[in-house]
Regions:
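Active-site acidic short loop of glycosyltransferases
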Residues: 15, 27-29, 94-100, 122
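Catalytic nucleophile-loop/oxyanion-hole region of alpha/beta-hydrolase
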Residues: 74-86, 133
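Alpha/beta-hydrolase
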Residues: 159-187
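Conserved HGGG/HGGXW glycine-rich cap/lid loop of the alpha/beta-hydrolase fold
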Residues: 18-74, 78, 93
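Conserved hydrolase catalytic core segment
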Residues: 99-142
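Flexible "cap/lid" loop of the alpha/beta hydrolase fold
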Residues: 126-166
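Conserved acidic catalytic loop of the alpha/beta-hydrolase fold
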Residues: 83-101
């Protein structure tokens, strides 16, 4: 459970007709803009690192991306694409008056950070990637290879549930549990 501490600054930023909630910790001149994992996770699971880095003299800025945490949660599938997320980050940057900053992307936030840095390189002082992947086509190939090892019947079942939008079905979830145990966390 993350440590609870009130942010030094909390803002609501308009994005695409909705609002996202931003959090700032610390007041140093060295800014660390953190993009967390997900998509769909609020940034609070990284609260302890926010606090630690603020205590080390950084101003740490994070936000609940659209669709999660305390930000608005629109039910609009057209919003969920990487280009729009990149523009969301840029909108937040401008709204908070951030010039050059250090960008840290964790997990999904790493993918987003790479795209943001390629689109807005002049805003970036440094880029740190944590627990992420830099080559999505390779990742997709490897994930499919791992899934194929479950056998043709299981793969057919998974593809069926994915096409039907029923990935919450118990047999699909059982297959995901096996994949996660074999390839993500073996505890």
């Amino acid at each position: 459970m993350p440590t609870h501490i009130e942010p030094d600054e909390l803002c609501r930023v308009p994005v695409d007709g909705y609002e996202v909630v931003t959090y700032s910790y610390g007041s140093g001149d060295n800014i660390l803009f953190l993009l967390n994992g997900g998509p769909g996770l609020p940034c609070d699971y990284l609260r302890d690192p926010h606090i630690f880095l603020a205590e080390e003299g950084y101003r740490v800025v994070a936000f609940d991306q659209l669709g999660c945490g305390k930000s608005d949660r629109p039910d609009e599938p057209s919003l969920w694409n990487i280009a729009r997320y990149v523009e969301e980050v840029e909108t937040v940057r401008k709204a908070l008056g951030l010039e050059k900053f250090n960008l840290l992307g964790q997990s999904w936030g790493g993918w987003l950070s790479i795209e943001y840095a390629l689109t807005y390189p002049d805003a970036i002082q440094s880029l740190v990637l944590a627990n992420t992947c830099g080559d999505l086509p390779h990742l997709t190939t490897e994930l499919n290879r791992m899934r194929d090892a479950l056998g043709s019947e299981t793969v057919a079942m998974m593809l069926h549930h994915e096409s039907m939008g029923t990935i919450d079905h118990p047999e699909y979830q059982a297959a995901i549990t096996i994949l996660n145990y074999r390839h993500v966390c073996r505890l």
